[in-house]
């Protein structure tokens, strides 16, 4: 079996490549399959599938849902999603509206301190794009407020920063069950990024399995061999499908 990438983002969320550019890059890299998993949306899937139609690559429709966990969120990737599924579309619109409300308030807070961030700039000419904190980071760099993305997140976009506005998440159960209802395969994304102890991770997976979780990312761009070995054993323990991806965002 050839190389696949089951976790990528496009300009329909916080990536810098359009869906068609993503397909072209995947083909040029010799990938056998690629999944588009934009945050909380499937709006880029039609362009993605069309771009791959005559290419020697399998294009997998997907998404990455942010679901509530403690005082933050965790991410559930959904692969092989029916992007036309009515229930999924409704839930996606609810999530996007919540994001928009949060983003508008964050932009207003920046403007009050004479940092002229607007929603028009954040969407960058693509009104269907799901705006994330990465979009804010780009503009903070553009306006010379910070030098790089890490500085933007540490000083201005972290939950402890005065510009940060929390948003309301859907529940873990709702996210997983909606992916399943749309014919998708729900997978816990980048489990080590949540900084949980082994006991906490196992407790979370026990709960998510009850809701229908089917897989976990055992390969990820920042994982060491030791990390991968650890998560692969966790996957076996919980009888979860091993998945993996780069979490490619283009130049972000």
Give short role names for the model-derived ranges.
Residues 1-72, 155-159, 170-252:
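An N-terminally biased module of ancient metal coordination in phosphate/nucleic-acid-related enzymes
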Residues 51-206:
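Extended substrate/RNA-proximal surfaces in nucleic-acid metabolism proteins
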